[in-house]
Amino acid sequence: MPLSNGRNRRTRKLFKRPFRGHGLSNTSTILHTYKVGDYVTILCNSSIQHGLPYKAFHGKTGRVWNVNPHAIGVMVNKKVNNRIVVKRLHISPEHIRPSGCQKDFLERKAAVAAIRKQNIQLKKEGKPLLPLPAKRLPKQPRPAELIKGADIKFTTVAPLKFEELY
């Protein structure tokens, strides 16, 4: 009914489980170790109502600020009118998963650390240092290619000469 205003109202499609994904979740979701400062994504699991966050936080990414035996404290930014408010939620671990938002950053950080380690070794040997990647670049165009072979026939394309139709 459209006028009923319960806590989980209008979540029929939002909280639905994926195809062949019904029933209880794996134990690995509960046993995952979260530390303070980790980025997590809130994805509500409707098969477990305990510790289920409000529907407005479904799909949001936040940081862990508190770890309890049965719940994880997550800080999430929420837009309220014309400002952004930090909300602190306690969520059951079934409804959160590690976020991949820092994956690219951590990979680049590890790559830069490896280059710096190589540069220390090269400096001791007196060889030129490797350049550090300054910032991320968009995908570059493909390099030029040479076409080899005498059997390739080229045709010159030119516009037709204008002829008056009147």
From Swiss-Prot:
Keywords in alphabetical order: Cytoplasm, Endoplasmic reticulum, Ribonucleoprotein, Ribosomal protein
UniProt xrefs under Gene3D superfamilies: 6.10.250.3260, Ribosomal protein L21
Top-level taxon of origin: Eukaryota
Compartments reported by the entry: Cytoplasm, Cytosol; Cytoplasm; Endoplasmic reticulum
Alphabetized PROSITE patterns for the sequence: RIBOSOMAL_L21E
Residue intervals passing through the bilayer: none
Outcome after substituting residue 116 to T: In strain: 200:NIH
Any one Gene Ontology cellular component term annotated for this protein: cytosolic large ribosomal subunit
Single Gene Ontology BP annotation: translation
Disulfide bonds: none
Binding partners and assembly: Component of the large ribosomal subunit.
Family, as annotated: Belongs to the eukaryotic ribosomal protein eL21 family.
The protein's name in its UniProt record: Large ribosomal subunit protein eL21
Gene source species: Entamoeba histolytica (strain ATCC 30459 / HM-1:IMSS / ABRM)
GN (gene name): RPL21
